[in-house]
């Protein structure tokens, strides 16, 4: 089974004010992709937090976009590359997009 070439991973909690950025933006993106006839090229994934398991969602993709609310980010958003060589953080809680990408490079790629 082939996967869409692009994946968008959005995290956040809709019940926590500005932490709802990821899910709200993902919902708008889904509508736009449908309207433009591009939905088949994207897999949209929503979760409360980025987890190690999300590294598996990167397999066989051309590109990935991580969406999350941030603290002290320039308004209204910041778009920046993720360093795959950042050391993965270890936590039983959420991990950063850089850590997800680092796990992907260590385990999947």
PLM regions with names:
Residues 1-109:
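N-terminal catalytic or cofactor-binding beta/alpha core of small enzyme domains
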